[in-house]
Amino acid sequence: MQKIRKGDKVIVLSGKDKGCSGEVIKVNPKENRAFVRGVNMIKRHQRQTQNQEAGIISKEAPIHLSNLAIADPKDGKPTRVGFRVNADGNKVRFAKRSGELING
């Protein structure tokens, strides 16, 4: 089970976008990297195709998972993630800072 998943609200801990927050768009567990909406933007030169016109586009670059922390559902501050088993027998994630369950 992954600690950071698609749809999670995360905070960047280091790098040029330190302190910024956003939503995880995509996670690549084999490379330990994630794409976060609006964070770590890069410019790419786009060649013209039938569907798209040429120009310079901005898109997200991947960030290493060690540079991200989940935002605590209670106060929005960075927290570590723990796992526990519910009474139903389901394994769920919780914020170690507040003890709140993390959605998903």
Curated annotation (Swiss-Prot):
Keyword annotations: Ribonucleoprotein, Ribosomal protein, RNA-binding, rRNA-binding
PROSITE patterns to which the protein is assigned, alphabetical: RIBOSOMAL_L24
Molecular-function GO terms, alphabetical: rRNA binding; structural constituent of ribosome
InterPro entries per the UniProt record, alphabetical: KOW, Rib_uL2_dom2, Ribosomal_uL24, Ribosomal_uL24_CS, Ribosomal_uL24_KOW, Translation_prot_SH3-like_sf
UniProt GO BP: translation
Any one annotated GO CC term: ribonucleoprotein complex
Superkingdom, taxonomy of origin: Bacteria
Coiled coil ranges: none
Subunit structure: Part of the 50S ribosomal subunit.
HAMAP family: Ribosomal_uL24_B (MF_01326_B)
Function: One of two assembly initiator proteins, it binds directly to the 5'-end of the 23S rRNA, where it nucleates assembly of the 50S subunit.
Family: Belongs to the universal ribosomal protein uL24 family.
NCBIfam families cross-referenced by the UniProt entry: rplX_bact
This protein's name: Large ribosomal subunit protein uL24
Lineage of source species: Bacteria, Pseudomonadati, Pseudomonadota, Alphaproteobacteria, Hyphomicrobiales
